[in-house]
Amino acid sequence: MKTLYSLRRYYHVETPFNSSIAGRDIESTGFAWWSGNARLINVSGKLLGAHVAHAGLMVFWAGAMVLFEVSHFVPEKPTYEQGFILIQHLATLGYGIGPGGEITSTVPYFAVGVIHLISSAVLGFGGIYHSLLGPDTLEESFPFFGYDWRDKNKMTTILGIHLCLLGVGSFLLVIKAMYLGGVYDTWAPGGGDVRLITTPTLNPIVIFGYVFRSPFGGDGWVVSVNNMEDIIGGHIWVGLLCIIGGIWHIFTKPFAWARRAFVWSGEAYLSYSLAAISLMGFTAALYSWYNNTAYPSELYGPTGPEASQSQAFTFLVRDQRLGANVSSAQGPTGLGKYLMRSPSGEIIFGGETMRFWDLRAPWVEPLRGPNGLDINKIKNDIQPWQERRAAEYMTHAPLGSLNSVGGVATEINSVNYVSPRSWLCCSHFFLAFFFLIGHWWHSGRARAAAAGFEKGINRANEPVLSMRPID
């Protein structure tokens, strides 16, 4: 291949460990070093090394970050007040957590962190081996692991294997929830507890009803799930569908319409993957912000509506003890100050929190009757744990506003408190958005290449290539 630049210009930038290794330079790949794994499109062994090393980095982060959180854990404070995002995920699996969402032991978290660190070392070694010492391509030495991007049957077989692995992962959660100690259920009586999910929902009308719901208003799409039976039942269905679909793709060849409809190249597969990850990222952002079943508020802090309703409830409890008649007191607008009716006639909390009248949360549900909040329960059956939890949630809204939002004063929170819901929602949203941009970019390039026209910028026309070296 014709040299497009002065080699001397780049000597200080890159000194290859072994210049004979494939995928190292622009002459052998057509891509410069900053193009990353594009250099490895046609060297499957080196691409395997890159992916294994990347997996090692991810596992290392998980292990190191869990140990970091464990080392900073303060038992007297809730996890959502300590800037954690990983301990909560382990706690929801039933590890180290007791009634009311109290962290009872950090030993399981320490063990998980160490296991991840050890695993990352193994993956890291595998990544280095395949990047530097292993065969450049797998097709000759290990035909089962080798592939050609244009081999449609092989590509769908690889897809099938991935689907089967995802299905197995889904069933691991099901097994943990049903047989291996259970999972944390925020809806358990008395404020949440670890329990076995003995009767998961298997009714397809219920499970797939979430998928076909509207994402707007009170419908909430899949994010509206509000009980552990549906969550575990959903994982059973997902696991079954993934494994059945995986077996299908392993043992069949793509139909003619699929061969015509899709672009079959490495960059096309990358774009498909980026689109899938983007969708998962957006879904995770919505879940972490709105859902208080998969993301229990005892661990992640209240949702925005939950904090607002908590404040209304806290002031209702206070003023009722001071002698206020909470069922008839009027606010400055003439509407109910503490209680009022929703558009559908339910009794709801009054004041600015009325906008969140359809909130469902474990601490308030015991106070409801057949027509919204039960006046008799409000006056005679409020439990201390409900008061404590509402008072705590009231001051920990996941809001960064400098003024009142939904009736919740947030100026203090904007200074010294950031909810894990804010972190998780914003990070997943922005990452998902940029993954979507990546999907558009790579899908456009893949389609252009398949159509036979421009593949990137012609480097031969870059002015810098005709300039003399700096030194």
UniProtKB/Swiss-Prot annotation:
One Pfam assignment: PSII
GO biological process, one term: photosynthetic electron transport in photosystem II
SUPFAM superfamilies linked: Photosystem II antenna protein-like
GO MF terms, alphabetically ordered: chlorophyll binding; electron transporter, transferring electrons within the cyclic electron transport pathway of photosynthesis activity; metal ion binding
Cofactor binding: number and manner: Binds multiple chlorophylls and provides some of the ligands for the Ca-4Mn-5O cluster of the oxygen-evolving complex. It may also provide a ligand for a Cl- that is required for oxygen evolution. PSII binds additional chlorophylls, carotenoids and specific lipids.
Segments traversing the membrane: 67-91, 132-153, 176-198, 253-273, 289-310, 445-469
GO cellular component: chloroplast thylakoid membrane; photosystem II
Propeptide position ranges: 1-14
Function description: One of the components of the core complex of photosystem II (PSII). It binds chlorophyll and helps catalyze the primary light-induced photochemical processes of PSII. PSII is a light-driven water:plastoquinone oxidoreductase, using light energy to abstract electrons from H(2)O, generating O(2) and a proton gradient subsequently used for ATP formation.
Protein name stated in the entry: Photosystem II CP43 reaction center protein
Species: Trieres chinensis (Marine centric diatom)
Name of the coding gene: psbC
